[in-house]
């Protein structure tokens, strides 16, 4: 039996009584954002909208984007990345679980020195794929040209964000490259690996 999204009490500033809001709404108010699904236009627009609102509300407070995503639509992922670069506050990225494909691209887009992977997280990079399988030959050629432009854009961003040379990123993107948290740190996708709490 599905439980749905849990609700928690929250008192709005200036209000006497608390209201019940879903847990994600409560966390957004604390500047904690979540990408816990495949990247598509809907989730990209939601994240961008929240970032823009938080940016206009207070430009001095950082945002924290938790990533556990198998990837998804290239343009939707690039739009989230662009929004992260546009907002004034630093956007910390935290990888938990898996950040693959556009998920790893968004993870790498966090403020440099503020990108973290949890100890058992996995990161995967590869080249963008075309979703165009059926159509006129001319349309396929235009699609292939667009995919090559997107691949070039993504390669340049990864090189800039990781400090790795373009040729190495391009070579690695030819196949699925899976990285442990430590390997992702060595590669430059994240800056730190979180330490496990050993006091338990």
UniProtKB/Swiss-Prot annotation:
Chief location bin: plastid
Gene3D superfamilies assigned: 2-enoyl-CoA Hydratase, Chain A, domain 1
Catalytic activity, as annotated: Hydrolysis of proteins to small peptides in the presence of ATP and magnesium. alpha-casein is the usual test substrate. In the absence of ATP, only oligopeptides shorter than five residues are hydrolyzed (such as succinyl-Leu-Tyr-|-NHMec, and Leu-Tyr-Leu-|-Tyr-Trp, in which cleavage of the -Tyr-|-Leu- and -Tyr-|-Trp bonds also occurs)
UniProt GO MF annotations: ATP-dependent peptidase activity; ATPase binding; serine-type endopeptidase activity
Role description: Cleaves peptides in various proteins in a process that requires ATP hydrolysis. Has a chymotrypsin-like activity. Plays a major role in the degradation of misfolded proteins.
Homology family: Belongs to the peptidase S14 family.
Protein name: ATP-dependent Clp protease proteolytic subunit
UniProt source species: Adiantum capillus-veneris
Lineage: Eukaryota, Viridiplantae, Streptophyta, Embryophyta, Tracheophyta
Primary gene name: clpP
